[in-house]
């Protein structure tokens, strides 16, 4: 356990930041799942709307260092590709 007051404060801050980061990470995953759900249902319009919201949340995660830029780009690219194939197939 931390003995110095600065170390105790750092430990408190770490706990607080960890909770915030987990919340943000969970929110990003939830928005990605919403897009995947709309794609599985075949709703083009809803999938596009969900993608725009998810893309915004993913990029906010990049800005807050929750996920890396390349990871975010890969996720957005794969979701966009699925929606594009959905649009072409129907």
From Swiss-Prot:
GO (cellular component) term, any one: small ribosomal subunit
Native source organism of the sequence: Rickettsia felis (strain ATCC VR-1525 / URRWXCal2) (Rickettsia azadi)
InterPro entries linked: Ribosomal_bS20 (IPR002583), Ribosomal_bS20_sf (IPR036510)
GO MF entries: small ribosomal subunit rRNA binding; structural constituent of ribosome
Disulphide connectivity of cysteines: none
NCBIfam families: S20 (TIGR00029)
GO biological process: translation
Protein name, UniProt field: Small ribosomal subunit protein bS20
UniProt record similarity statement: Belongs to the bacterial ribosomal protein bS20 family.
Function in brief: Binds directly to 16S ribosomal RNA.
Entry keyword set: Ribonucleoprotein, Ribosomal protein, RNA-binding, rRNA-binding
